[in-house]
Amino acid sequence: MKPKFDGYATQYDAWFMENDNLFQSELRLFQRALGDISGQRVLSVGCGSGLFESMIDHSGIEGIEPSRDMGAIAQKRGVNVIAFGAIEDADLEENAYDVIYLNGSSSYMEDLHKAFAVCKKALKPGGRFISLDVPKESAFGFMYLLAKNLGTFDHPYLNGVMPQLPYPLELCSAGVWHSTEEKINVLKDLGFHDFDYCQTLLKNPMYTNEDVEDAVPGYQSGGYVAIIARK
């Protein structure tokens, strides 16, 4: 099966560059969730084009990416892509990583339990698991689900409420979209503990690119949410 992002790598990066304030807001959340990772072994699951990684010191970051188009760009940006494929099928070294994170990739995974279980097995005891993504229950989640089902952003239901430059429809349509509570429950079922949360994009979607937002604690209001838990 063709990976969902094959053929859309350039479009993905261009969208973030055109929505720079939104990108900077998500980047601040990304940086806050990761914290200081110097000297740690870190794995990015669904590393994409390595756009976010290119904005931080990513010398210790390894990546797994289903799309060869995206992964090739990540490699050029200095991410050590160790495998092309899905995390569910990955054969990772056990108890090897200090941090494993999914930045925007869980929304393209059908079986969260299987994916998160693979990550847990590869984490060191006490290692951190981080999931950053658009919650299904957020305004962005509703907008993407509606556009996916309508097959377009150009519809009377969405007129007057859309951002100027919405996320590419092809990528919305490929998404599964999970709620934050669903992800938390899966992680708890797997035995993760010491949960922490932070969020950004608190404005409605049509206003989120007006200003850069700082990440704030919690998960009940944001359009982009980080869940942090320990093995």
Say what each PLM segment does.
Residues V99-L112:
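A short SAM/SAH-binding and catalytic strip from SAM-dependent methyltransferases
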Residues E88-I100:
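A short acidic, Gly/Pro-enriched loop at the edge of an enzyme's catalytic core
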Residues L43, G48-D89:
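Class I SAM-dependent methyltransferase SAM/SAH-binding core
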Residues S173-Y197:
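Short alpha-helix
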